[in-house]
From Swiss-Prot:
This is tRNA uridine 5-carboxymethylaminomethyl modification enzyme MnmG. FAD binds at residues 13-18, 125, 180, 370. Belongs to the MnmG family. Keywords: Cytoplasm, FAD, Flavoprotein, NAD, tRNA processing. SUPFAM superfamilies: FAD/NAD(P)-binding domain. It comes from Enterobacter sp. (strain 638). Its main location: cytoplasm. Homodimer. Heterotetramer of two MnmE and two MnmG subunits. GO terms for biological process: tRNA methylation; tRNA wobble uridine modification. SMART domains: GIDA_assoc_3 (SM01228). Pfam families: GIDA, GIDA_C_1st, SAM_GIDA_C. It is found in: Cytoplasm. GO terms for molecular function: flavin adenine dinucleotide binding.
Amino acid sequence: MFYQDPFDVIIIGGGHAGTEAAMAAARMGQQTLLLTHNIDTLGQMSCNPAIGGIGKGHLVKEVDALGGLMAKAIDHAGIQFRILNASKGPAVRATRAQADRVLYRQAVRTALENQPNLMIFQQAVEDLIVENDRVVGAVTQMGLKFRAKAVVLTVGTFLDGKIHIGLDNYSGGRAGDPPSISLSRRLRELPLRVNRLKTGTPPRIDARTIDFSVLAQQHGDTPIPVFSFMGNAAQHPQQVPCYITHTNEKTHDVIRNNLDRSPMYAGVIEGIGPRYCPSIEDKVMRFADRNQHQIFLEPEGLTSNEIYPNGISTSLPFDVQIQIVRSMQGMENAKIVRPGYAIEYDFFDPRDLKPTLESKFIQGLFFAGQINGTTGYEEAAAQGLLAGLNAARFSAEKEGWAPRRDQAYLGVLVDDLSTMGTKEPYRMFTSRAEYRLMLREDNADLRLTEMGRELGLVDDERWARFNEKLERIETERQRLKSTWVNPLADSVAEVNAHLAAPLSREASGEDLLRRPGMTYEQLVQMTPFAPGLDDAEAAEQVEIQIKYEGYIARQQDEIEKQQRNENTLLPEMLDYRQVTGLSNEVIAKLNDHKPVSIGQASRISGVTPAAISILLVWLKKQGMLRRSA
């Protein structure tokens, strides 16, 4: 039986990728259907109760700049906000927020249910309708068929999902949810390369059984950061601290003594896990020289007693999990309310996708999220938005769009995936972007909102606020450029008080702001340059644009040079362990692949453009640079 109305776009799955995809397609005016096995779990945080972090926060800001949902949702659900790397340069500063799971899910569902052009329907999907290598619809569990011009698959870990706790395992999409077996089998019949990955989650602890009095507190920042360019701190709920404990030798002994009961070490799990979010058993074995690991005790919400112990993801048996938890300070009497587990699932080789996230083999079929081999809510949301907007464009018979590497971390993400693929869960870091000085959190709107408007993703309210901000930035830059202070003027003493050496010649506000140690806030408190902007975002942008102008110009030159090095040959017998500055991951992959050129090296999954830059500098210093004819 066919549903009475056809749709332009169908989204299968209501996680972080699916919800962004559905919102994007609907915002662009296309009739959109979101199919989910359970409406109550739309936007659910399956693992850690947090949004953002290094590289990840950048993606959230970019999703927001394109009119997406995630930043708005976390502003209404975040119970602790921090700026990571606050003491470092603006390129690597990143926002992170602890979330109240219930508030986050509510914010997502409210947005979905109030989005025009979007219908939500609760039914698991078991099949796709494919005609002449083109997807034209989907079939649900009860045999109901929906027709559409484009379909987006955002099924997370549900495809043939298998949950492991110790040596026991069972089918599941995540704890408490069934897997998607029939759809997995159907997709395996299509001309797509499929493999298995694994991820895990820690046990959840009853907060009433933890002695917080002996633990260090970690508070959020003041003033409280805001994620969305449309948000404000007044939207945040009550703010609460996290707590810190540590594993110890007793913890590590428990783990080492029970490795034979670990599904990973017993060879039961075939899928490869995330390198940068390893299980506690992996950490203990890989970093045997460390006698402790830091564990963050993160509240799951304002109305919940559950605590997420960030850092002890595990698939060891439940009795071992209890021993691990109770071996740590403050946790001696702790009770587990949900066991930790590992989950294996199908993912599809993203090299089979176009940069728009459309399949190269099935027209109109788009993939986003963990099905593409990524890990993390933020990576999923970014892909979901891109897949949703391109599914909408496909259904309207328009060309697809994907950002370049120099435009967005989203561009880095999809280029890495579609060009190099991945053999392990892919996570975003600032180090993956060679243009990171230009791809900052603070300028995500300046980079992407205009394009979002052209694509139909950005509404009138956001567009108006964006243009007001642009005008304030430009007006203030011109004011500082044209406001001068003379070394003989009466007001110069006020200026000299903030300088390492007194002014010897006339200087503009821009000249002074470029000086080391001078901030915009200091500058506009001086009589010649007062008053300053009362818009903190615009003020930050003025300072960064002026201070980093020269660095950005130099980075552009470096980019051009790097492109000329495409055919630079690499020594055949080079041991990459000699190259200082490369990560262990990159060293292992270069030594394994032994690429013949820089160009070939740059296409190896996991070898970042930043690593290529390090390698080029090292080769030049060693006098080993050779170019092919």
